[in-house]
């Protein structure tokens, strides 16, 4: 399952200007708000990652997802990781041996993200 999203960073800047913390709290977790510190590129990348994740997870037909169902965290080595906030979904993924991965990139005024969900397989 695959989801992709691209966003013009100015859209996030305008949403911040117009709606402020109401927008932030509707889309981002406290961790993400603290991590990005109002950096538009950081917030745009996470927005794109959440949109891509919603698209990828929609193929599972479990339920409808929202932005706050997902949290984009930094791994120990700086790679973005997707954290799912719903215990039921985590249990479902574990039972089906599915693992989501995300990638975020920025180019000039755009941020793009991909989420793909793959079967966990042991190698050996």
Swiss-Prot record:
<keyword id="KW-0963">Cytoplasm</keyword>
<dbReference type="InterPro" id="IPR004568">
    <property type="entry name" value="Ppantetheine-prot_Trfase_dom"/>
</dbReference>
<dbReference type="InterPro" id="IPR037143">
    <property type="entry name" value="4-PPantetheinyl_Trfase_dom_sf"/>
</dbReference>
<comment type="similarity">
    <text>Belongs to the P-Pant transferase superfamily. AcpS family.</text>
</comment>
<dbReference type="Pfam" id="PF01648">
    <property type="entry name" value="ACPS"/>
</dbReference>
<keyword id="KW-0275">Fatty acid biosynthesis</keyword>
<feature type="binding site">
    <location>
        <position position="51"/>
    </location>
    <ligand>
        <name>Mg(2+)</name>
    </ligand>
</feature>
<keyword id="KW-0276">Fatty acid metabolism</keyword>
<dbReference type="InterPro" id="IPR008278">
    <property type="entry name" value="4-PPantetheinyl_Trfase_dom"/>
</dbReference>
<keyword id="KW-0479">Metal-binding</keyword>
<dbReference type="GO" id="GO:0000287">
    <property type="term" value="F:magnesium ion binding"/>
</dbReference>
<dbReference type="GO" id="GO:0006633">
    <property type="term" value="P:fatty acid biosynthetic process"/>
</dbReference>
<dbReference type="InterPro" id="IPR002582">
    <property type="entry name" value="ACPS"/>
</dbReference>
<keyword id="KW-0443">Lipid metabolism</keyword>
<protein>
    <recommendedName>
        <fullName>Holo-[acyl-carrier-protein] synthase</fullName>
        <ecNumber>2.7.8.7</ecNumber>
    </recommendedName>
</protein>
<dbReference type="GO" id="GO:0008897">
    <property type="term" value="F:holo-[acyl-carrier-protein] synthase activity"/>
</dbReference>
<keyword id="KW-0808">Transferase</keyword>
<keyword id="KW-0460">Magnesium</keyword>
<keyword id="KW-0444">Lipid biosynthesis</keyword>
<dbReference type="GO" id="GO:0005737">
    <property type="term" value="C:cytoplasm"/>
</dbReference>
<feature type="binding site">
    <location>
        <position position="5"/>
    </location>
    <ligand>
        <name>Mg(2+)</name>
    </ligand>
</feature>
<comment type="function">
    <text>Transfers the 4'-phosphopantetheine moiety from coenzyme A to a Ser of acyl-carrier-protein.</text>
</comment>
